[in-house]
């Protein structure tokens, strides 16, 4: 492991020198690639520096303890040694986690799709609740959220389907754990007998594709335009600015109605279509590693019930790892960091175990 870390440190230094060369900025694509590679290695290098420093301090403290005669000084040195001996395994574990193979899509922005499932109007309202939860979480993270497309339900405030783009630092690395079926248990406002109803909504988190990721033939596309709808379903535009694109070989559809011009909506819809096709490619690649991924947190099986939101008990349970929180109101306000961190930790632990097999 330490030979690999030393090699990474040398690579990081080489990248730093390349980026410092004034000629590097002349090729923007190459510069961005170098800068991303440099940034990806920075955290590992800094962690390795902390580990190396702690090891050096431990060696020096042991040498000092062997030569020191003063009892008080020896006691202080012994305390320093014990602190460092406790600190080193933690630093080594951090390095092992950082060295785990990264998902190539982790640094990407995402397209999120939220769909109401079983439960009628209550499911549509729950889909809207999930949308607000993710929007508030994104705001806390300093990410940008753009609502791309939506279909409202018959009940005011509900959605049958919502598509949004979330952009920022390492969005997919964080949000990929949210894919799956989310279940809610609560008493609807219209329930006069006080009975608890169970409803569901599905969430799909797709890493946003770049133009180079997927080759799409123009002949394989059908473009339709229509008037974008406002809240409540009324047509607020007199011109057909909304765009729907159908990929004929697969039947996959992408639509956008939120931008002001047809051209902007077309560009957004193409990004969504590329993302959906890219997701199919990724799924095919991930299938080849299915045996390994069975031991990991499921991040993509959208047929699996992953989480339950129980309102009467103010409880949120993630069924994949047995995580339970009784802070449901805060979670629905976007404070889902603890849930996601627990999923990340479980994922890392499983992957470390798989690496050691």
From Swiss-Prot:
Keyword vocabulary terms for this entry: Cytoplasm, Methylation, Protein biosynthesis
Residue numbers of N5-methylglutamine PTMs: 234
GO CC entries: cytoplasm
Entries under SMART domains matching the protein: PCRF
GO terms of molecular function: translation release factor activity, codon specific
Subcellular location: Cytoplasm
Name of the protein described by the UniProt record: Peptide chain release factor 1
